[in-house]
């Protein structure tokens, strides 16, 4: 049996921009991607804490150190600059993999600086 579980999330990221006139996606700072073990092109769920919106998109690479979190294309209609969001990725695990299951949780501050990295929910 396999089960879909949390793989990684960036918790309470601040939206730095919303660019409607761009091919759809979410731009994420390279350092945040590395810390969260997320990958360019990976499907992610976006949970908007401010308005309750939940939608999916894919990741594109943001410039290292700029702390950009930018929703692009149609997704830009679902957020406003300054909104708090959670960027979530799931993965499918089998029973054996679940014995050592440790999701990655990256906690960020209002400037999208990493405050803590957890390996638990």
From Swiss-Prot:
It is found in: Cytoplasm. Heterooctamer of four alpha and four beta subunits. InterPro entries: Asp_de-COase-like_dom_sf (IPR009010), Asp_decarbox (IPR003190). GO terms for molecular function: aspartate 1-decarboxylase activity. The keyword Cytoplasm applies. Binds 1 pyruvoyl group covalently per subunit. Its cofactor is pyruvate. One of its GO terms (cellular component) is cytosol. It catalyses: L-aspartate + H(+) = beta-alanine + CO2. Is synthesized initially as an inactive proenzyme, which is activated by self-cleavage at a specific serine bond to produce a beta-subunit with a hydroxyl group at its C-terminus and an alpha-subunit with a pyruvoyl group at its N-terminus. Belongs to the PanD family. The active site is at residues 25, 58. It is an enzyme of class 4 (lyase). Substrate binds at residues 57, 73-75. Its EC number is 4.1.1.11. Transmembrane segments: none annotated. GO terms for biological process: alanine biosynthetic process; pantothenate biosynthetic process. Pathway: Cofactor biosynthesis; (R)-pantothenate biosynthesis; beta-alanine from L-aspartate: step 1/1. The modification Pyruvic acid (Ser) is found at residue 25. This is Aspartate 1-decarboxylase. Catalyzes the pyruvoyl-dependent decarboxylation of aspartate to produce beta-alanine.
């Amino acid at each position: 049996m396999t089960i879909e579980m949390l793989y990684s999330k960036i918790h309470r990221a601040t939206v730095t921009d919303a660019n409607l006139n761009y091919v759809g996606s979410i731009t994420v700072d390279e350092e945040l991607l590395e810390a969260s073990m997320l990958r360019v092109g990976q499907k992610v769920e976006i949970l908007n804490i401010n308005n309750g919106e939940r939608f999916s998109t894919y990741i594109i690479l943001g410039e290292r150190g700029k702390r950009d979190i930018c929703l692009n294309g149609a997704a830009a209609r679902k957020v406003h600059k300054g909104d708090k969001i959670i960027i979530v990725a799931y993965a499918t695990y089998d029973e054996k993999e679940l014995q050592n299951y440790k999701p990655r949780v990256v906690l960020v501050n209002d400037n999208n600086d990493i405050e803590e990295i957890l390996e638990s929910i």
